[in-house]
Amino acid sequence: FFIDEDQRVTWSDIGRKAEIELRARLAGATVTHMQLQSQFRCNGSDGYLAWLDDVLGIRPTANSVLDPDDFDFQIFDSPVAVRRKIEALNAKDNRARMVAGYCWDWKSKRTVGAMDVVLPEHGFSMQWNLARDEGLWITALESVKQIGCIHTCQGLEVDYIGVIVGPDLVVRDGQVITQPERRSRQDRSLR
């Protein structure tokens, strides 16, 4: 099993290390612990992972600043600016996409042409990734015109990702706070 106990997509996610060890013992299996030393997804940088842990408040680390020479990390004031940047980066080799937490209803699933992620204060609207693309949406040529949700991008890889932070994630008094009640009621992972 490959486990990151700091990540969870649904309330019902199972597989904590202690639970797997218990089940293995009950089945008479031997457990061998190994640690992933680096990840290709983040240039093999443990510093990037430590920075994420620090900035998201998972655990304090010595990496409170991201090295700008290793990563292109930008914060935009507008989702329109994010979309423009992602479209420009994608024009090179089809390896840039946008994602968001499941905070907006998936209206286009039933109503062709309906927009899903709508932020009227920014003049921004896009559709969720299309149902017809299923698990391959991120590689489809036209998917740069869609937004993937956390359920459809988990484990997939691109060179550039634009993240729309929805109302389920806020910063209060310097702390990152999750508000799961602000996610779409269509999100079955909340049940």
Indicate residue ranges for each PLM-predicted region:
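Signature of the SF2 helicase/ATPase Hel1-core->accessory helical subdomain module
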Residues: F1-L36
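Core RecA-like ATPase module of SF1/SF2 helicases and allied nucleic-acid translocases
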Residues: L26-R191
